[in-house]
C-alpha cells in the first residue's frame, strides 16, 4: 500500500466521520436567536424557549430533505465500503480500482444531497424559499460538517486517482 492510498483512505475516513456527525447533530439550520432559538436537523429539531431546557423532537421532513438524508446515508455507506476496500488493497491490489469508483459514487451522492437540501427551505419552521433562507436564519454547524465531508471526499479522490502527485 503506497502513501497516496493511505492519505486517500484517511481523507475518506474523515469525510465519513464528518458526514455521520452532520446527520447526528440537529444544527443544519439555525435561527440564531437566544429567545426561542430553533435548530433544525435531518433527524432532530430542537428548540430553546426563553432560557428553558432544550427540547428536541423528530421533525416531519419535507420530501426534499428525506431525499437529502437518503443520499447522505448512501454516501456514508459508499465511503465506508471504500475505506474497507482500501484496507483490502494492501493484500489485493485490484481492490483500489473498485474503491475509487465507489468513492466517486459517494461524492456524487453527497453533491446531489447538497443541491437538493436548499430546496426544502420553504418549510414553516424555516420560513424561506427554495435556495433562499430568511435574513434571521443561517446554516448551522451540521451543514458545515457536511460540506467538509464533500471537500475531503473530493480531495481523497484526487489522491486515490493519483492526480495529486507530489513533485
UniProtKB/Swiss-Prot annotation:
It comes from the Eukaryota. Keywords: Cell membrane, Cell projection, Differentiation, Membrane, Transmembrane, Transmembrane helix. It is found in: Cell projection, Cilium membrane; Cell membrane. The keyword Membrane applies. GO terms for biological process: cell differentiation; cranial skeletal system development; negative regulation of smoothened signaling pathway; regulation of neuron differentiation; regulation of protein stability. The chain crosses the membrane at residues 7-29, 68-88, 101-121, 139-159. GO terms for cellular component: ciliary membrane; Golgi apparatus; plasma membrane. It is a multi-pass membrane protein. Pfam families: Atthog. Its main location: membrane. Coiled coil: none annotated. Acts as a negative regulator of hedgehog signaling probably by promoting internalization and subsequent degradation of smoothened protein (SMO) present in the ciliary membrane. Plays a role in sonic hedgehog (SHH)-induced spinal neural progenitor cells differentiation. This is Modulator of smoothened protein. It comes from Danio rerio (Zebrafish). The gene is mosmob.
